[in-house]
Each structure stands twice: as C-alpha cells, then as structure tokens.
Amino acid sequence: MKIGILSRNQSLYSTSRLIEAAESRGHEVKVIDALRCYMNINSEKPQIHFKGEELVDYDAIIPRIGASVTFYGTAVLRQFEMMGVYPVNESVAITRSRDKLRSMQLLSRKGIGMPITGFASKPDDVKDLLDMVGGAPVVIKLLEGTQGIGVVLAETRKAAESVVEAFMGLKANIMVQEFIKEAGGADIRCFVIGGKVIAAMKRQGAEGEFRSNLHRGGSASLVKLTPEERKTAVAAANIMGLNVAGVDLLRSERGPLVMEVNSSPGLEGIEKATGKDVAGLIIDFIEKTAATKRTKTRGKG
C-alpha cells in the first residue's frame, strides 16, 4: 500500500516508528507536512499538491496533526477523504475531540464518568462557578492548553478566584474541575485501536506535581486495567469516532473518570512502558480496514 503520514517532522519518535513499521511490512510511506500542502477544492477532481507535485494514488493517510495546526491540518485531511483516501482517524472525529467543551458534552450525554466540570468564558459570579463544581481544591484549565500547559491546581477558594480572574484577563475560555485527590497525581493512558485497548500505562506526576504528563517530568509504568476501565476507554473513543485514540482516565472512588480523548496519542511513552509494538499494531489495523474504505463521513463532515 501507499501510505501518507501527515506530520511536520519525520524525526519525531511517533512518526519515525510508523515509518519503520510500515516499511518493514513492505508499504511505501511518505511524510507530508500539512502546512506545506495546497489544494484545489473547486474542481470535480479534488487535488492536493505538495512541493510542486500532485499527491495521487494514496491508499491510506495517518494524521499526526499537532493541536496548533488543527484547522489547516484537518482541512488537508478532509481533502484526502474527498479524494477517496482512507483516513486512520477522520477529520470530523479529530476536530470533535480537539474541542474540549464539545467532547466533554458528548461524553457526558452518553453517561461516561467524568470529574464534575464547569466551563466559562466571562463568569459574572466566580464564587458561584466554584460552588457549582464543589468548591476548592479545583483544577483550572485553559481550553486551548496541551501537555499540561495552562493547567493550575488551586488548593483554596481564594487561590481559585485569583486564577479564574487572571485567566479572564487573558480573555481565555476556561474549564474548572473538581480535584480527584485519591488519584494521587496519577492517571492512566489507554491506547485504543479499532475498538480495543491494546496497551495501557500509568503516568505518575513528578514529586510535588499533580500533572502526570510525561512532558512535565512524569514517569510511566505498565498497568493492569479493570474491565470497567477497559470498557470506558473503548466507549470514549467510539463516542469521538476515533479508530486510534489515547484515552486518559483517573481512578476515583466512583470508578474511572475520563479526562481527555487524544486523537494523536504519542507512541514513545506507551511503547517504552509496555514493550508493545504499537506502531506495528496501527499499520496492522490499516491493512485490515483500508481496503474496505470504512469511513463514516467520506469527507462531508
């Protein structure tokens, strides 16, 4: 097969592992920087050009689109979909999962467990907003944040009010969540491919750090999931419409709580923590599904 990987840097661990896994199975692979693509969208024959050449005859596309380039990256992916190329994750599913408010509303509607969460833009009563989620301590997040950036633990009501007011001064949309103390600064990343959890790791925050992101100095280790955790992770990925997803859970006294569903989960942490060939499993999934062109929206979303 001819497989394209939408990525801005082929030396990144995840991208290089996907190249390695695909080539070892005899596939032709090309890394495509979505920002350098340009498209003809007003033609009966939709086209994508990259470095002066038309991109043709691709069987599948693997989107590794960074959060900062979601708008244009998903536009390019949508164009591939319109050309009949099989997307590992569809453009509409990626945009759905990248919108934190929309994704949490969808998960809530389907009864998925989550921390009590408040959303706000310019709350005229910060005290009432905090009361809504049970009061301090609370976790306050910028809606556009990634990798633990823009996430603050406010341990007192006064601190929480100050952080909310500071974020309001930035004209930023915010999310206020209850703090799950029993999680102990750890979360679980479940890696879902094709409706199955194929690997899972526990991420523990550095000492004195409540954020468990590996980018913030956290550590990762193999973890055994409960049946409920496995079921929750698969359901969350399915609700987003993602074939490949990283579902982040917290262990709480009331069961697993979903924090986020990531449409472009990194491979380095999960492969090193579990010893599994996750990149190879993604290519295996493409081999089984690309020929059938099983895509729900066909680029209409």
Curated annotation (Swiss-Prot):
Requisite cofactors: Mg(2+); Mn(2+)
InterPro entries for the chain: ATP-grasp, ATP-grasp_RimK-type, ATP_grasp_subdomain_1, RimK, Rimk_N, Rp_bS6_RimK/Lys_biosynth_LsyX
Amino-acid positions noted as binding ATP in the UniProt annotation, renumbered to this chain: 141, 178-179, 187, 211-213
GO MF annotation terms: ATP binding; metal ion binding; ribosomal S6-glutamic acid ligase activity
Example of a GO biological process term: SOS response
Residue sites binding Mg(2+) 2 per the record: 260, 262
UniProt entry tagged with the keyword Metal-binding: yes
All copies of domain ATP-grasp, residue ranges: 104-287
Annotated positions binding Mn(2+) 2: 260, 262
Keywords: ATP-binding, Ligase, Magnesium, Manganese, Metal-binding, Nucleotide-binding, Protein biosynthesis
UniProt remark on cofactor binding: Binds 2 magnesium or manganese ions per subunit.
Binding annotation for Mg(2+) 1: 248, 260
GO annotation, cellular component aspect: cytoplasm
Family in the record: Belongs to the RimK family.
HAMAP family per the UniProt record, alphabetical: RimK (MF_01552)
Name of protein: Probable alpha-L-glutamate ligase
Organism of origin: Aliivibrio fischeri (strain MJ11) (Vibrio fischeri)
Gene that specifies this protein: rimK
